[in-house]
Amino acid sequence: MFNNDLRYKLADDAINKLFSAFPENKKVEDILLKISVINDLYSTNILATYQMAVHIQKLDIDTKVRAGNIDVVNEIATGHNIIRKDINTELNFYSFATKYCNWHNQDDYAIYDRFVSKTLTAYNKEYSFSNFKQTDLKDFRKFKQILEDFKKHFNLNKHNLKEIDKFLWVYGKKNFPSNYQKN
């Protein structure tokens, strides 16, 4: 279904092309371009894209992302000093960080979003494929293990993380629609 919808297929193709053209995270302008595209196509709500780009550049993530280092997700998601002013708290951009890492290394990084979360929770309630709490989905190490449990339970080992993600997202979007749907 995902690849049959031209909107999603072409968006994925565009992001793949962009990340192939700018695979490194050395130049702020390259990082800013990638952030802006992910932010627009995935509605990740990063209003301070320049600040996030500088943050990612300072982290020097290229070697770690290629190696599939799980800690990179949290490093990107936090420590950027993008503050929610009304409560004076740094925002956690976990969902964005999973997407940014995924587009650099789709074999080692899965994408987290509300649709994936709702789908995994619903499947676990019905089939008990893994022992997890809702908060575990926002811990990338645990999230990745939950996805492995899902793959094993449903005999999906021939499918990669990207294919599993697309299924979870499409299922969640269809079965757990939000009040606001971006076209």
Question: Where do the language-model regions lie?
Answer:
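Short hydrophobic alpha-helical segments that form membrane-spanning helices or hydrophobic packing faces
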Residues: 96-101
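An N-terminal alpha-helical hairpin/helix-loop-helix interaction module that forms a charged
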Residues: 1-88, 106-183
